[in-house]
């Protein structure tokens, strides 16, 4: 594995639901990079094929709310009726090990992280077209029609915030590897930037 000589970087990967963030993370894990992938905690039900502790940390609501009360999350929010939170230990463990930390989070959560770690690298994934996004959500077959319509309405609002991010990466249909290569290059360029300061959670 390559050395990581510059200060560890916090990379915040965001974008609307269905844009392909999970697929991008799966491809990024295949690269030989000194990266630590944050696992988000959630109270939502596990989906077919997901693994507890790998895809998400699945918690019941009382356990989650207890952690929230103890201020054990970098940020947490209720999204689509379920709680999601980033355990502080997931971020600090990665940074303390000297690895760059990759954090996948929704747009609402990214705004909170920006306040706590303004010198992080914020990357926003966008679909090739809104029709592609609609098709991806339809193919999931895990959403009811009202839920899908809600996600599409929220996605429209979130896409309007793309300019607030440091970098936008297009994930077009059948071009996932190109999107991941773009993310990889963006991280490498940020690592080489002069004057970058260590990540401190405010």
Per-region residue spans from a language model:
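Post-Walker A helix-loop "phosphate-sensing" segment adjacent to the P-loop in P-loop NTPases
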Residues: 30-38
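Extreme N-terminal, non-catalytic leader segments
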Residues: 1-10
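P-loop (Walker A) phosphate-binding loop of NTP-binding proteins
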Residues: 14-16
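ATP-binding Walker
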Residues: 19
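Walker A/P-loop
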Residues: 22
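Conserved phosphate-donor/acceptor-positioning beta-strand/loop module used by diverse small-molecule
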Residues: 101-106, 116-139
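ATP-dependent small-molecule kinase phosphotransfer cores
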Residues: 42-101, 108
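NTP-dependent small-molecule kinase module
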Residues: 4, 142, 157-202
């Amino acid at each position: 594995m390559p050395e990581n000589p510059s200060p560890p970087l916090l990379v915040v990967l965001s974008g609307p639901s269905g844009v392909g963030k999970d697929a991008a993370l799966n491809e990024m894990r295949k690269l030989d990079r000194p990266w630590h992938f944050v696992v988000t905690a959630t109270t939502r039900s596990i989906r077919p094929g997901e693994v507890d502790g790998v895809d998400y940390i699945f918690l019941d609501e009382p356990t989650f709310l207890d952690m929230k009360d103890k201020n054990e999350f970098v940020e947490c929010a209720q999204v689509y009726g379920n709680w999601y939170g980033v355990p502080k230990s997931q971020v600090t463990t990665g940074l303390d090990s000297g690895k760059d930390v990759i954090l996948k989070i929704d747009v609402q959560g990214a705004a909170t992280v920006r306040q706590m770690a303004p010198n992080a690298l914020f990357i926003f994934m966008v679909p090739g077209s809104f029709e592609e996004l609609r098709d991806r959500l339809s193919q999931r077959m895990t959403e009811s029609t009202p839920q899908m319509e809600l996600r599409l309405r929220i996605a429209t609002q979130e896409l309007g915030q793309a300019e607030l991010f440091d970098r936008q990466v297009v994930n077009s249909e059948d071009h996932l590897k190109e999107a991941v290569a773009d993310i990889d290059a963006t991280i490498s360029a940020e690592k080489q930037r002069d004057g970058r300061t260590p990540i401190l959670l405010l």
